[in-house]
Design a protein with these regions (language model features):
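Conserved adenine-binding aromatic site and its adjacent loop/helix in ATP-hydrolyzing domains
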Residues: 120, 152, 179
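Residues that scaffold the ATP/ADP-binding catalytic core of kinase and kinase-like folds
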Residues: 145, 153, 176
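Clamp-loader machinery-focused feature within the broader ASCE/P-loop NTPase space
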Residues: 1-145
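Conserved catalytic/switch belt of AAA+ P-loop NTPases
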Residues: 123, 148-162
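Charged, glycine-rich active-site and insertion segments that engage polyanionic ligands
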Residues: 1-55, 64-67, 156-305
Length: 305
């Protein structure tokens, strides 16, 4: 697997190397949190159909650039994973060869139907004689069936097509897809301090519970986890944030222990592995968000006891 490190001008670097050297790949995997990976994917996709991108940059003057432009203040078309209340994918701007896929409104997954629709669209070839590009944003929300369907496309990619996957973590994508993709890593844009003036209120509330884990009863932790019941799409987003905060809190806890000359306990290391497994259960196995939150909090309580 080829790899690139994130730098501030990463879109230009990627395109200079890929387009300038005529080595555009069939699959890319952008990983990192925050908006930058998805924004970069959109810029990259637009540049791949730009008529004047020999320097690896979108010219913004050719017809392709005009058609692929999206007003930042505009409202994107709402998708539906089942294709009943809306389309399964949309175009970037109104360019027919730039496709964008993400979870549908209220959906908990990127569905296998959405991936199959993208397969069909990519195999049809470009409408305007250049490349056809598909971006899958939030690719970590594909379940194993959708990922396996995508793998079949990558095993025999149509000519002059590129697929750009955007995921918060590479580990959420199966190894056989990762091995066929050029990896682009981004720094964590959304990371915030757990205890500073810019910490969001919902994060501060979680940290307060974690800081007092040793004093929390099982009942209190179960009561806290009850907030993650309800509509699964919303609850899953909340538990994803809970997992992120817990992972950072645990990392700092272990770091503090090492700084005091203590050896991290086996239970702390096991808790870190459990965090990753719970993340996979939530995303790939459709686990109940409230139950994931309960297992997470009770497991951390045991780890620091």
């Amino acid at each position: 697997m080829q790899s690139e490190a994130h730098r501030e001008n990463v879109p230009a670097e990627i395109l200079r190397r890929s387009i300038g050297n005529d080595r555009v790949h069939s699959s890319y995997l952008f990983t990192g949190t925050g908006q930058l990976p998805a924004t970069t994917a959109q810029v990259f996709a637009r540049a791949l159909v730009c008529r004047n991108a020999d320097r690896g940059e979108v010219c913004e003057s050719c017809d392709a650039c005009h058609r692929s432009y999206e007003d930042p203040e505009g409202t994107p078309i709402v998708l539906d994973g089942k294709g009943k209340r809306g389309p399964t994918h949309r175009h970037i701007g109104d360019h027919p060869d730039l496709l964008w896929v993400e979870r549908g409104d209220g959906d908990t997954r990127i569905t296998i139907g959405q991936i199959r629709d993208i397969q069909i669209a990519l195999r049809l070839g470009a409408n305007e004689g250049g490349r056809r590009v598909a971006v899958i944003s939030g690719a970590e929300w594909m379940n194993p069936q959708a990922q396996n369907a995508l793998l079949r496309l990558l095993e025999e990619p149509p000519s002059d097509t590129s697929l750009i996957l955007v995921a918060s973590r590479a580990s959420a994508i199966i190894a056989t897809i990762r091995s066929r993709s050029v990896r682009i890593r981004f720094e964590d844009e959304s990371a915030v301090g757990l205890r500073d003036s810019e910490t969001p209120a919902e994060v501060a509330e979680i940290v307060q519970v974690l800081d007092d884990l040793r004093g929390q009863s099982v009942g209190q932790l179960l009561d806290f986890a009850e907030q993650y019941r309800g509509a699964r799409a919303t609850a899953a987003e909340g538990v994803t944030e809970l997992i992120d905060v817990c992972a950072e809190w645990l990392r700092m806890e272990v770091k503090d222990r090492v700084g005091r000359g203590e050896t991290p306990t086996t239970r702390s290391l096991d808790a870190h592995r459990s965090l990753q497994q719970l993340r996979r259960d939530l995303v790939q196995r459709n686990a109940n968000p409230q139950m994931v939150a309960e297992r997470l909090l009770l497991g951390l309580r045991d780890a620091v006891a």
